[in-house]
């Protein structure tokens, strides 16, 4: 569980990084492209689209570029969120709180490398899934325990405890859904 102090520190760090974030977020860009390639294959029903943990809006921009559909960007970092100058709707929101989407018109929710920053990520995924209309899609990319092997190796060599986040395993998320409700992509 991420405590309130840590959440505020994470927010501060993202706000401070907003100016240069796009230059250094290579893995996020890679997975944004994978998400967009997957979206192009899907028939998404009419409804509202959301990018949760949107940051500077790189993924939402790419989605709008191919679909002509407006994507609401949601993030808890004001500087990240408002760095993107598009006229798309933006919602400053801490994703640790329930989303204010009670209209049951949501047909697409995407989230790219955000889930690991949240308390109770498995619960959040299930809650997001429950917001979708029938036939809607939730597409989430997450770092896994295979990420950052250099960091783990260095800790092992120095005989110190691994100090990174212990990421969810894809299987942990996949097991929450029926087989016909989920598509997993190999990394």
Predicted segments, located by residue:
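N-terminal, positively charged/glycine-rich alpha-helical extensions of SAM-dependent methyltransferases
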Residues: 1-19
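Conserved alpha-helix/loop element of class I SAM-dependent methyltransferases that forms part
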Residues: 26-45
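Class I SAM-dependent methyltransferase SAM/SAH-binding core
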Residues: 49-99
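A short acidic, Gly/Pro-enriched loop at the edge of an enzyme's catalytic core
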Residues: 99-109
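A short SAM/SAH-binding and catalytic strip from SAM-dependent methyltransferases
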Residues: 107-120
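A short glycine-rich, Lys/Arg-flanked "PGG" loop and its adjoining helix->strand segment in the class I
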Residues: 122-137
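Conserved catalytic/acceptor-binding region of the Class I
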Residues: 137-187
